A protein has these predicted regions:
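Membrane-interface helix termini and inter-helical loops of multi-pass transporters
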Residues: 15, 45-49, 98-112, 164-181
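Helix-helix packing/entry segments at the starts of transmembrane helices
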Residues: 38, 53-62, 132-155, 189-201
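Juxtamembrane helix-loop boundary signature in multi-pass membrane transporters
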Residues: 64-124
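Specific transmembrane alpha-helical segments of multi-pass solute transporters/efflux pumps
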Residues: 10-54, 96, 185-201
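Specific alpha-helical transmembrane segments that line the substrate/conduction pathway
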Residues: 42-78
Length: 201
């Protein structure tokens, strides 16, 4: 059995087991958490040539703001009164972190503004994926949530890569690159996300 046939079997299993609402939230987790969030944060880091890491990484800390807002809207979870104050303070801190005490402006040759926007998009994507993941765990175990997330993320990323840059760059990756990819997948990838879903139950 080749890899493509295995993916088809897994896909049909997922479609057969879960209803349309569950599949929609699985897709949202894959689209935002697995694809857009990852692409956005990597794009942000490349825009600043891995400098200004403080700005890019600290703006990521705003993702709980988006998660809590969406949890209120989608999951109908109640917000404490103090949330509005701390949420506003976090957004204000994010602004000063990016622009200091200046108004936003685009400086030629400076990618910090674009990188900050990508970082905010990543924060929104990861934050929303937390909410969608919480909804998914009502219908699936944390292990199944991980497997289906990877399955759908692979499908989404396959389409994105096919429609944008193509697959030519795969041939340029060295053995060392693939080893690093595997290490990332097994540690901060699969291992971390499995613990994340375990705690999100």
């Amino acid at each position: 059995m080749d890899v493509l046939s295995l993916w088809k079997i897994l896909y049909m299993w997922v479609v057969f087991i879960y209803d349309k609402n569950d599949l929609f939230f699985f897709f949202c987790v894959a689209l935002f958490g697995g694809s857009l969030g990852t692409l956005s944060i990597v794009k942000a880091l490349f825009l600043v040539n891995f400098k200004h890491l403080t700005v890019v990484t600290l703006l990521q800390k705003l993702q709980p703001i988006f998660a809590i807002i969406l949890a209120r809207l989608l999951l109908k979870e109640k917000l404490k009164r103090a949330y509005l104050f701390w949420g506003f303070l976090a957004l204000l801190g994010g602004y000063f972190l990016t622009f200091e005490f200046n108004l936003p402006e685009v400086v030629e040759g400076d990618n910090l503004l674009a990188a900050s926007l990508y970082s905010l998009l990543a924060a929104f994507s990861f934050g929303s994926a937390t909410v969608f993941g919480k909804r998914v765990l009502k219908a699936a175990s944390f292990r199944t949530a991980l497997y289906v997330r990877y399955l759908m993320t692979t499908c989404v990323m396959f389409i994105i890569v096919a429609l944008t840059c193509g697959f030519g760059d795969f041939s340029e990756a060295t053995g060392g690159n693939w080893l690093i990819f595997v290490i990332i997948a097994l540690t901060t990838g699969s291992g971390a996300i499995l613990l994340y879903y375990f705690g999100l139950r």
